[in-house]
Amino acid sequence: MKRPLEMAHDFLAEVVNQDDIVVDATMGNGHDTLFLAKLAKQVYAFDIQEQALEKTQERLNQARMTNAQLILQGHETLDQFVTEAKAGIFNLGYLPSADKSVITQPQTTIEALEKLCHLLVKGGRIAIMIYYGHEGGDLERDAVLDFVSQLNQQEYTAAIYRTLNQVNNPPFLVMIEKLERYRHG
């Protein structure tokens, strides 16, 4: 059985190609940025921590990837850099090996999700990995689930991929796809 992060990558890889612009809304250590850079024409990656940019740039350099723009700003500013996107990924929570008090916040995450949903091309997808075992994580989890569950079903399909028998708040995946055409009925 695939782990949620593997499923997230597969979900995006099904639709992203070398002509596409994509977003890594939470750069972190750069694993998703590198994954997307190997698939897409251009990656816009966001984080508010300098350490994230440094680690990501190092990872990209080692792989000789030059098609990622690393942006030291919150993901809620993505519309200042991106006019349309084929896909996006969020890893919500905190940067491993960094200050665990610096966490993604419900307000800015929802703002970023709203903007990315609007900028998605038809057939585009968003993968949201939700880590919620830390203080404040449950609030963000609930805000994201509330936002996604209210997306217009004529425009989007949304699903959850999660393990049911794991303890200690296992991370789970929320998937959004912008429909190719409106469905009626």
Language model region names:
Residues 29-40:
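Conserved SAM-binding loop of SAM-dependent methyltransferases across substrates and taxa
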Residues 1-21, 54-84:
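S-adenosyl-L-methionine
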Residues 42-47:
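Conserved SAM-binding motif I beta-strand of class I
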